[in-house]
Amino acid sequence: MKTEYIIGILKNVSIFNQLDDENLELLSKKFVFQKIPKDTVIFKENDLGNQMFVIISGVVEVFKEYRKKRKTLALLKRNDFFGEISVFTSLPRTASVQTLSNSEIIVLDQSDLINIIKNNYKFSLNLIKVLSKKLINANAEIQSLTFKNVQNRATTQIL
């Protein structure tokens, strides 16, 4: 895949869009392109992982399974990224990811991402900002689910 094409993609990805052209070019050469068929599990919760992914085309579902029930956490599309938690924490994957359509992604290894963090202050600050927004959204979802559970329990007690 051409470097210019990957640079064009990265300029639209929230964690990479603050990089200058020189760093984008260096980073773009580290990505590996993959075509993934519909219904392919990219990774499962609790898998070990040292790569993050950027979607070029297609849709993927991020989900968790509990007692044979599946809960969709997010639907991701072009210019979205995933897999970063394991890259930064070296912990197992926190959710599973599966393609919902034929998809094209680019993959970046942990060591390459860590190098750009070490060498680019502006990138590091932007990364903190983007990940903080993800945390805020996750906290809002938790709060919403907690409130719904309280309402459901209260309704059940009244009936």
Give the residues covered by each predicted segment:
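Short phosphate-coordinating micro-motif centered on Lys-Gly-acidic
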Residues: V41-D47
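Short, small/polar residue-rich loop motifs at catalytic or cofactor-binding pockets
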Residues: S28-K29, D47-G49
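Polybasic "coupling" helices that flank or enter modular domains
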Residues: K118-L159
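Short, locally clustered residues in the helix-turn-helix/winged-helix DNA-binding domain
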Residues: K11, F43, I56, L159
